């Protein structure tokens, strides 16, 4: 997978792209991630990328010219499956979308900044708008990292245990179950006996039931009409 990130603060990504899962994916050759400084496509002596909004109002708006120049340059070199814009008013980013994106080849992720980006960018260049929650951040850089982490961990070979990602929360429409490790008893708190039994079918059944109980307690809307009956 190849991912192009467009940002006004490219240095933000220096450490995350070298450490953790993103660094592993790159070192294994399973992902290419390139960061592009939007100011390199800015206007004039000071490489301006933003301006005041028409009609007045607080904040600044990213101009269309730098974004068009950057994305069109990338698209002239190769084709991209999606041009993703990280924005609070986008579609909710969830595990289903992460699964779908993990099957793509080339992605462009545009990180918003300032008050907004010019609407003509969204109407013409952007193919997917994603939000990581009902909260406003200072820019799209942190959400972009969240998307990349969620997507790349699903690519075969990135995680040491390939099955681990397939049993995470949301993969089967439920939250994940409770997990335990050694010691079997800690400060009077014991691991459920079934997990020590060695009976794989019973263990799997316990995990499914526990996952459903946790989902009903913490995120009942995920169970839909079934939770309403209960």
Swiss-Prot record:
NCBIfam families xrefs: PRK00026.1 (NF000648), trmD (TIGR00088)
Superkingdom as given in the UniProt entry: Bacteria
UniProt key word Zinc-finger: no
Subunit details: Homodimer.
Signal is among the record's keywords: no
Pfam families associated with the record: tRNA_m1G_MT
Binding site for S-adenosyl-L-methionine: 112
Reactions catalysed: guanosine(37) in tRNA + S-adenosyl-L-methionine = N(1)-methylguanosine(37) in tRNA + S-adenosyl-L-homocysteine + H(+)
Name of the featured protein: tRNA (guanine-N(1)-)-methyltransferase
